[in-house]
């Protein structure tokens, strides 16, 4: 066992797929015998946009759109030799961004 700390950040627009991916990562890491903490839900980033419906006049008539970016954090406190192999062999669904820092 090494004392290398690995931090995994997951980002996505759909929180259900994000939670499934986090669970898949946690299960794969527990099979290797690594000590983990998480997944920790981080604050959701909400971007709001207002667009004028009409192309010419009527500024009073606007449409609002928003994009919600959900985030999860997983820390691997103690790794084993199989941990990195398990992380590289994972097949995560489309729509989930993963960022791994050593």
Curated annotation (Swiss-Prot):
Question: Entry's SMART domains?
Answer: Ribosomal_S10 (SM01403)
InterPro entries named among the record's database cross-references: Ribosomal_uS10, Ribosomal_uS10_dom, Ribosomal_uS10_dom_sf
Pfam families xref list: Ribosomal_S10 (PF00338)
Transcription as UniProt keyword: no
Name the UniProt key words of this record, in alphabetical order.
Ribonucleoprotein, Ribosomal protein
One Gene Ontology term from the biological process aspect of the record = translation
Molecular functions per Gene Ontology: structural constituent of ribosome; tRNA binding
Aminoacyl-tRNA synthetase found in the keyword field? no
What GO cellular component term, any one, is given?
ribosome
Q: What does this protein do?
A: Involved in the binding of tRNA to the ribosomes.
Q: Which NCBIfam families match?
A: PRK00596.1 (NF001861), rpsJ_bact (TIGR01049)
Q: How does it assemble?
A: Part of the 30S ribosomal subunit.
Q: What family is reported?
A: Belongs to the universal ribosomal protein uS10 family.
The protein, known as: Small ribosomal subunit protein uS10
Source organism (scientific name): Dehalococcoides mccartyi (strain ATCC BAA-2266 / KCTC 15142 / 195) (Dehalococcoides ethenogenes (strain 195))
Q: What is this organism's lineage?
A: Bacteria, Bacillati, Chloroflexota, Dehalococcoidia, Dehalococcoidales
Q: Which gene encodes it?
A: rpsJ
């Amino acid at each position: 066992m090494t004392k290398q700390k690995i931090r995994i950040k997951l980002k996505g627009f759909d929180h259900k797929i994000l939670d499934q991916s986090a669970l898949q990562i946690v299960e794969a890491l527990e099979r290797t015998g690594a000590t983990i903490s998480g997944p920790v839900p981080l604050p959701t980033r909400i971007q709001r946009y207002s667009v004028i419906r009409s192309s010419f006049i009527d500024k009073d008539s606007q449409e609002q759109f928003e994009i919600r970016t959900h985030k999860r954090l997983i820390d691997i406190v103690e790794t084993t030799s199989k941990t990195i192999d398990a992380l590289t062999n994972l097949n995560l669904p489309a729509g989930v961004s993963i960022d791994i820092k050593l």
